[in-house]
Curated annotation (Swiss-Prot):
Organism: Lobularia maritima
Protein's recorded name: DNA-directed RNA polymerase subunit alpha
UniProt main location, coarse: plastid
SMART domains per record: RPOLD
Segments for region (Alpha C-terminal domain (alpha-CTD)): 267-327
Gene: rpoA
Catalytic function, reaction form: RNA(n) + a ribonucleoside 5'-triphosphate = RNA(n+1) + diphosphate
């Protein structure tokens, strides 16, 4: 087990693993922190990350079994201790790791008497077994048992309802979820307007991925969801009842900000308070509530940052720049 003391960063936002352990071949645990965060950000990130960890990460499972020895899935076979249903349930529990895409075939071909475990599965090169000791069946007599297996990589659940009795092929309910559980908690520190948060994220996996690998994959999946928003070239605003549609180009906030900084000395910005700018009361109150007190605070925010302020609009950003350019 690896455990580190938690040191709170006061500068750059960063992830850190503070605890890592392997409880068994099929149970890994990791605890991570992200800090420093503004009030409310930890819960937003924690909820999104937990959902991505539990629902967006792909896993590999056995999804079908076929054998000439099996008449139907609730039958008992002479020379085998377990029922067919129990064997299918045991195959469902096998933990696999792979980077395959599509479907692959595997095979079990054993002669009794003896125990059949996961190590008896003949796998394609792209797939490996996490725990070779996982039990599948017990052969009590000198019989031959051959089972063809179908392996797939997917995400979430796959509940197979239909059986194909004609070719003696039986579906297996698959749980493509390497992350068994994920929790997040929040620790707040600081006072008043300076209050910040630390996000603690706990991850348990089945061994096919480490918690760190799961965290990276969940993060990539979330990033990919938001990338399309970075390529938006225009904003579309819909009026009441969608009767009219107005399309406006993105406001060139950055260009005007650069020009403004060229005209004025940035060093002086920190000594100019926003109440000196003669802003409309609503805009002034919105900025104050967001801890923007000086001109430097204001200019350190992008157009996107300002629009995120509650009750703040695109027109307010334009009005602010118009006022600043006259100063």
């Amino acid at each position: 087990m690896v455990r580190e003391k938690v040191k709170v960063s006061t500068r750059t936002l960063q992830w850190k693993c503070v605890e890592s352990r392997k409880d068994s071949k099929r149970l890994y645990y990791g605890r991570f922190i992200l800090s420093p965060l503004m009030k409310g950000q930890a819960d937003t990130i924690g909820i999104a990350m937990r959902r991505a960890l539990l629902g967006e990460i792909e896993g590999t499972c056995i999804t079908r079994a076929k054998s000439e020895n099996i008449p139907h899935d609730y039958s008992n076979i002479v020379g085998i201790q377990e029922s067919v249903h129990e064997i299918l349930m045991n195959l469902n529990e096998i933990v696999l790791r792979s980077n395959l895409y599509g479907t692959r075939n595997a095979l079990i071909c054993v002669q009794g008497p003896g125990y059949i475990t996961a190590q008896d599965i003949i796998l394609p090169p792209s797939v490996e077994i996490i725990d070779n000791t996982q039990h599948i069946a017990t052969l009590t007599e000198p019989i031959d048992l051959c089972i063809e297996l179908k392996i797939e990589r997917n995400r979430g659940y796959s509940l197979k309802m239909s059986n194909n009795f004609e070719d003696r092929s039986y579906p297996i309910d698959a749980v493509f979820m390497p992350v068994q559980n994920a929790n997040h908690s929040i620790h707040s520190y600081g006072n008043g307007n300076e209050k910040q948060e630390i996000l603690f994220l706990e991850i348990w996996t089945n061994g096919s991925l480490t918690p760190k690998e799961a965290l990276h994959e969940a993060s990539r999946n979330l990033i990919n969801l938001f990338i399309p928003f970075l390529h938006v070239e225009e904003e579309t605003f819909y009026l009441e009842n969608n009767q009219h549609q107005v399309t406006l180009p993105l406001f060139p906030f950055h260009n005007r900000l650069v020009n403004l900084r060229k005209k004025k000395k940035e060093l002086a910005f920190q000594y100019i308070f926003i109440d000196q700018l003669e802003l409309p009361p609503r805009i002034y109150n919105c900025l104050k509530k967001s801890n923007i007190h000086t001109l430097l605070d204001l200019l350190n925010n992008s157009q996107e940052d300002l629009i995120k302020i509650e009750h703040f609009h695109m027109e307010d950003v334009k009005k602010i720049l118009d006022i600043l350019e006259k100063k």
